[in-house]
From Swiss-Prot:
EC number of this enzyme: 7.1.2.2
Membrane topology summary: Peripheral membrane protein
Name assigned to this protein: ATP synthase subunit alpha
Location relative to the cell: Cell inner membrane
Species: Ruthia magnifica subsp. Calyptogena magnifica
Gene name for this UniProt entry: atpA
Transmembrane segments: none
Amino acid sequence: MQLNAHEISDLIKKQIEGFDFDAEVRTEGSVVSVSDGIVRIHGLADVQFGEMLEFPNNTFGMALNLEQNSVGAVILGDYLHISEGDVVKCTNRLVEVPVGEAMLGRVVNPLGKAIDGKDDIDVQGARPLEIMAPGVINRKSVDQPIQTGIKAIDAMVPVGRGQRELIIGDRQTGKTAVAIDTIINQKDSGIRCVYVAIGQKDSSVAAVVRKLEEYGALENTIIVTAGAASAPALQYIAPYAGCTMAEYFRDRGEDALIVYDDLTKQAWAYREVSLLLKRPPGREAYPGDVFYLHSRLLERASRVNAEYVEKMTNGEVKGKTGSLTALPIIETQGGDVSAFVPTNVISITDGQIFLETDLFNAGIRPAINAGLSVSRVGGSAQTNIIKKLGGGIRLDLAQYRELAAFAQFSSDLDSETKAQIDRGQRVTELMKQNQYSPLSIAEMATSLFAVNSGLLDDIEVNKVVDFEAALIAYMNANQILLMSKINDTGDYNDKISNELQAAIDDFKQNHTW
């Protein structure tokens, strides 16, 4: 078959007319150097701070240093396959993490990818890693309690919804145990929980997952983990990722709780990243913005008003307030709370629960130091009955610790001092609580009423714990209506006081422990 010149020109015209080409404009650069998870890139003129960068083999990084002739970025994951000369592309979007109900019950890395061996997560959307904290006008005062189920905390240092309460202490003093017990106690409260594990052993995180599953709290919890073997950049962004996931629930008019375990390791990771990026070091070799590292994270925990929720949901949710409560954990060295990072976080938060090694070793667990622990806003959110019955507990314990130290040097004590020491010993025993056994409001109120009314004065100190366990079992079995009323209303009046008195008197007369 022969084609003449006219047919050939027609074919060429058709080909030209049918040619479809969409011009794609993007900024590209090339890798100049790569080491220790830090990449120097040349040519990304339009990159913005915190932007997600695309590397070969579906690897992503984050731009942190914007210099005149180069860009310093951290790799979010494995970087061993990246080499000099590789092409780097801008994505024109900040680092994002997936959010939504589907994340509950799952273990994910800081980028939101499942690492629990189950199916992929069907995410409902994504949000930027870093979001501005709600403004002053959008906030509401903290006036609702979050029950930890731990007597010593709910009575002495209560936590409110939307509060930031620091848990601080040396290693192996029960900091994680307090946080996990609090999460377990939320399984029927409707409060969504996020547990962020930073720089921990994978075996430790697996143990936490097993415990939450055992007590039925995992289905209500998201676990974000950046283990000890993870890149420092992932440990640095892990708290922000967890916070973004928790804010999804707050902004929909729900209540959420987030635990950062722990921010000391995040500060170490950020220090490592900053030094590798050749940022000038300051005190203890931390960069100059280490305070801002934690303040911009913890300020995102808040209680927001209904107008804010309505705006964030585009009018879908009306008339509901939301809250995000933060329990950051800080590890101290040798009980030194005046070190750089601990003082920073203490100044940012709304109070602290100080756990002491000496108390822990003495068998007083949770090892809460009543004198150094404080809650700056939780008192206004405390349940009425716990507030009235537990008001003097903190003072009793603090005075007892002082008197006990003084009594070691003197054998001749007046009757009033002896009475205070005897009461303090019983209160100390009463504040002991086993791990994974949170108490309801009514159970807590029963214990506090017993010690406040002097009903423990004739109980031997070493029998107080057994007496309390038997009393609570008796109340749950024989005083169901009274316990339900206290749990439902949280009120305290003369009628409830008389009923509690009669019930405990009956127990002491007719039961053994």
